[in-house]
């Protein structure tokens, strides 16, 4: 099991020539062991991009102990 030290989220958006928006959500998960996991989700809505990024993490959160997430 690893303990998550921090999760950073960034969002990028672009408009195409038809003014349609597309989003990319980047998640950077840093573990107490020093490992870094980066996942990016793309979508035509912010929610879709966020959901895809979190789905790619593929982590099972076992418990939250003293504000630390154990996966």
From Swiss-Prot:
Source organism superkingdom: Viruses
Lineage: Viruses, Riboviria, Orthornavirae, Pisuviricota, Pisoniviricetes
InterPro entries referenced in this protein's UniProt entry, alphabetically: Coronavirus_Orf3 (IPR006784)
Name of the protein in question: Non-structural protein 3a
